[in-house]
């Protein structure tokens, strides 16, 4: 009986881990979070609606398409915006990185603010989201290399560029995972991380406990098993997707802004 129980428990854990992986990471699975309206597009709720509406119109009317090819062969899309002021300062850029289940449009308000301050603004689509190719979301770990390549696109066209990185939610974690990498060009002079998370593993454990009412031990086991599936399918483990090692090596000024937790903890 004990053996049967063990086999059944192992099977249930494996099934739960597989479900978690597909729900949280696989953007092509029709039952994943990416096909459900679990996260509101406006992460700031009803705040500054007038400004948001103006920014959305500006975003739609002035966006210029741009694209790169990722290191693993995916075509990544983004939008470029000219400064929206009379006498912009040359060579200053802001890259606004959207979050989990998001799109560049969710950064419209911030992109417009930076453009009005004289920045040339880039708002990329994260891999496997919006217009960019890919199937699996990297929780910032895979996306950090994509962000480095977007930075390189700017630096290659303007070697005097001074770049500000801004990210919200998973975009904030992408920024944090990028700032401490040895490849980061000196052109990146500052970063802002809004409502990011430090570890994908801990984020998923907290989410599993909150959404599915799992005990902590079971949630940890399920997430760790899902991480093994993720390693095989997407090329990374949830334990790798942590910004703490990067932040230890970050030397540029960085502002951290912590807001209320979003649904699914992201």
Model-derived regions: residue spans:
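Serine-hydrolase catalytic core
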Residues: 68-70, 76, 224, 230-266
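An N-terminal hydrophobic leader/cap segment in hydrolases
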Residues: 3-69
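Short beta-strand element of the alpha/beta-hydrolase
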Residues: 90-99
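Conserved alpha/beta-hydrolase
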Residues: 111-133
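Alpha/beta-hydrolase active-site loop
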Residues: 137-158
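Alpha/beta-hydrolase fold nucleophile elbow
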Residues: 157-169
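Hydrolase active-site cap/lid region
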Residues: 177-239, 245
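Glycine-rich nucleophile elbow surrounding the catalytic serine of serine-hydrolase chemistry
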Residues: 167-177
């Amino acid at each position: 009986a004990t053996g049967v129980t063990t086999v059944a428990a192992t099977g249930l854990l494996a099934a739960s881990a597989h479900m978690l992986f597909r729900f949280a990471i696989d953007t092509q699975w029709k039952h994943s979070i990416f096909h459900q309206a679990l996260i509101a597009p406006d992460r700031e709720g009803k705040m500054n609606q007038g400004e948001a509406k103006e920014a959305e119109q500006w975003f739609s009317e002035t966006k210029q398409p741009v694209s790169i090819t990722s290191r693993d062969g995916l075509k990544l899309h983004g939008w470029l915006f000219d400064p929206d002021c009379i006498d912009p300062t040359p060579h200053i850029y802001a890259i606004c990185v959207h979050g989990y289940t998001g799109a560049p449009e969710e950064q419209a308000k911030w992109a417009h603010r930076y453009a009005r301050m004289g920045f040339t603004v880039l708002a990329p689509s994260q891999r496997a989201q919006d217009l960019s190719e890919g199937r699996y979301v990297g929780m910032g770990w895979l996306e950090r290399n994509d962000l480095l390549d977007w930075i390189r696109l700017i630096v290659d066209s303007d070697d005097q560029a001074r770049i500000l990185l801004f990210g919200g939610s998973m975009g904030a974690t992408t920024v944090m995972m990028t700032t401490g990498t040895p490849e980061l060009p000196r052109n990146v002079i500052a970063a802002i991380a809004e409502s990011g998370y430090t570890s994908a593993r801990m984020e998923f454990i907290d989410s599993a406990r909150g959404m599915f009412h799992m005990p902590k031990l079971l949630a940890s086991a399920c997430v760790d098993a899902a991480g093994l599936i993720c390693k095989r399918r997407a090329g990374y483990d949830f334990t790798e997707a942590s910004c703490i090692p990067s932040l230890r090596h970050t030397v540029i000024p960085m502002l951290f802004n912590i807001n209320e937790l979003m649904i699914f903890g992201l």
